[in-house]
A protein has these predicted regions:
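Intrinsically disordered, low-complexity linker/loop segments enriched in Gly/Pro
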Residues: 106-128, 133-136
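Conserved small/polar residues in nucleotide/adenosyl-binding loops
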Residues: 263-265
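Helical (often loop-to-helix) elements that flank the catalytic cores of nucleotide-handling enzymes
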Residues: 152-176
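A short glycine-rich, hydrophobically flanked beta-strand micro-motif that places a catalytic Asp/Glu
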Residues: 130-143, 217-228
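Histidine-centered divalent-metal-coordination microenvironment in nucleic-acid enzymes
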Residues: 100, 137-161
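ATP/Mg2+-dependent ligation/transfer catalytic cores
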Residues: 1-79
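Active-site/ligand-binding surface loops and adjacent short beta/alpha elements
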Residues: 174-228
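Active-site acidic/histidine clusters and adjacent loop/turn architecture
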Residues: 63, 82-91, 97, 101-114
Length: 265
């Protein structure tokens, strides 16, 4: 257990009313587990998450608002702890898990993973009780203009267990790292299990370079999960081809407000 993170959570939930109220509301959230084609889906009715799910992420809206992850724009009550030389760890005031963190870069730089994946692995080591996740700029990130990771406590995502049970085709093995394709339709999940940081990065870069980039985008559309399991790194990569489903913009009875970030996948 990372005592610095636990202390931050405790202090923020006792002193910051917004976070305090939303974490209390999370305990009243309705949850239902259903299985579809053998895959477990955890349905959560969490009205407080509308702030993120309905966030406007078009270029015009982003340019017109102050970046809520820049240090100068944080609420006065929001405190953080440093991580490495470029990040700070914050309590997410709109939680989806019992312990939910946001880890933004101190500088205002775009949401891009390729040259920051190493930092993501380091964060998984530092916050060993957490799963680290990255949402691409057009894959659920509510701040696509500011580099950040998020973290949720282990045990709240079904993929943790399914990553062990649903390994299908072994794609490639390189030294102490293996790339698997999971049998978890309708998702398309690639899983890397690596015994060293170097081989995890090598296989991730291989997958990244093989993925197609959408026209006009600098980065292939993807969501990424990382956590430590004993001495190994587990990396789940979820390729994407669309930001929001057609039902998001549909009208009338066909409208369903679903905005898929990694947590929802």
């Amino acid at each position: 257990m990372n005592k610095e993170i636990e202390t931050l959570l405790s202090e923020q939930l006792s002193s910051w009313e917004t976070a305090q109220n939303n974490y209390a509301a999370l305990k009243r959230v309705r949850i239902k587990d259903v299985k579809v084609n053998g895959c477990l889906y955890r349905i959560q009715f969490n009205p407080a998450r509308i702030v993120s799910s309905a966030a406007k992420v078009d270029s015009k809206s982003i340019q017109e608002r102050k970046c809520f992850l820049c240090p100068a724009n944080l609420p006065p009550m929001q405190k953080g702890i440093p991580f490495g030389e470029h990040y700070q760890i914050l309590v997410n005031p709109f939680p989806i898990s019992p312990k939910h963190l946001t880890v933004p870069e101190l500088q205002h730089v775009e949401q891009r993973i390729l040259h920051r994946f190493s930092d993501m692995l380091d964060l998984a080591t530092y916050a060993e009780d957490y799963i680290i996740f990255y949402n691409g700029p057009q894959c659920g990130a509510s701040a696509p203009d500011h580099l950040h990771f998020q973290a949720g406590n282990k045990g709240f995502l079904p993929i943790e267990q399914e990553s062990k049970e649903k390994r299908g085709e072994k794609v490639i093995t390189c030294k102490d790292a293996t790339l698997w394709a999971l049998n978890d339709y309708p998702r398309a999940t690639l899983l890397i299990e690596a015994g060293s940081k170097e081989t995890a990065i090598m296989l991730f870069n291989t997958v990244y370079q093989a993925m197609p980039s959408t026209s006009g985008e600098d980065e292939p559309m993807m969501n990424v999960l990382v956590w430590k399991e004993q001495k190994n790194w587990i990396v789940c990569i979820f390729p994407r081809n669309k930001h929001r489903p057609s039902c998001y913009t549909a009208e009338g009875d066909t409208n369903i407000l679903i905005s898929l970030s990694l947590i929802h996948i």
